[in-house]
């Protein structure tokens, strides 16, 4: 029996499960409820024998996902989330069906994570990719960070994470962050072609291939999660993240200079 979702849309057509983050006014930024619903939707698609491919996207034509909702983060939502296992990312990675990210606009911060944890990324030519963490005092650590290096390489991953620059869809394609880039008007047709091609292949072989790739991810997850737990401490949330959230809401640059104290 289909679940009732609030923040997302879930539909299956012609053996394709389509999961849509449905918060377009917030540029499809997520809250804790959104993350829980996405996790449940991926689990639903994974156990549905009629589903052969999963497509993840955002509502509208402006954003795939702009990361965490800043109001939710300011109220402590991100603090609660980051200290828990990354259930959604693990669920996406371990889904036994091929997962396509249909990137229809901004893919920033946590939205960028979601895209690069999918098996394939098909982007509209106006899409923008990037990370926000150090710019807004919103930390990520462990597997979410180091998995990007497996996708685009160490140097580029460090550039993306540490400098918080923005990258065009063409740059994402050149870097290997996207598999294909097409005009927005052709995005659905292109995603449809990839789905048809995958659905014509042996589902058992695809499951075995996915399990093989997941074995590497589990190794990254084990090492990275230990690092995350040691480095992202509750003390961080007292000031730096709060300053980042306040600055965003007040439309000013955050002032992190006072947090640069010598550590021994």
Across the structure, where does each feature detected by a protein language model lie?
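Conserved CoA-thioester-binding segment of acyl-CoA-metabolizing enzymes
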Residues: 1-57, 264
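Terminal low-complexity tails and localization/encapsulation signals of metabolic enzymes
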Residues: 1-5, 246-264
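C-terminal long alpha-helix characteristic of the crotonase
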Residues: 24, 122-127, 178-226, 234-239, ...
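Glycine- (often His-adjacent) and acidic-residue-rich active-site loop
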Residues: 58-94, 107, 135-137, 220
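CoA-thioester-processing core
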Residues: 88-94, 102, 108-162, 175, ...
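Well-ordered beta-strand positions
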Residues: 120, 159, 163-165, 171, ...
């Amino acid at each position: 029996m289909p679940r009732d979702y609030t923040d997302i849309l879930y539909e299956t057509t012609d053996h394709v499960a389509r999961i849509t983050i449905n918060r377009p006014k917030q540029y499809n930024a997520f809250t804790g409820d959104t993350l829980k619903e996405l996790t449940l939707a991926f689990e639903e698609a994974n156990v549905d024998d009629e589903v052969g491919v999963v497509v993840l996207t955002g509502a509208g034509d402006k954003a795939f996902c702009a990361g965490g909702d800043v109001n939710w983060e300011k109220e402590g939502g991100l603090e609660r989330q980051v200290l828990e296992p990354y259930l959604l990312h693990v669920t996406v990675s371990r889904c036994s069906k091929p997962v396509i990210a249909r990137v229809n606009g901004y893919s920033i911060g946590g939205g960028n994570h979601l895209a690069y944890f999918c098996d394939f990324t098909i982007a509209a030519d106006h899409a923008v990719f990037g990370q926000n963490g150090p710019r807004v005092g919103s930390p990520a650590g462990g597997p979410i960070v180091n998995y990007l290096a497996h996708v685009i390489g160490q140097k580029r991953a460090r550039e993306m994470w540490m400098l918080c620059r923005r990258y065009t869809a063409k740059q994402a394609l050149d870097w290997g962050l996207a598999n294909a880039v097409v005009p927005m008007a052709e995005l659905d047709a292109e995603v449809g072609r990839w789905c048809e091609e995958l659905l014509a292949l042996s589902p058992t072989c695809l499951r075995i291939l996915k399990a093989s790739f997941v074995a590497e991810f589990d190794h990254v997850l084990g090492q990275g999660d230990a690092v995350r737990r040691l480095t992202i401490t509750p003390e961080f949330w007292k000031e730096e993240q709060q300053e980042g959230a306040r600055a965003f809401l007040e439309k000013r640059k955050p002032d992190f200079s006072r947090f640069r104290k010598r550590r021994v």
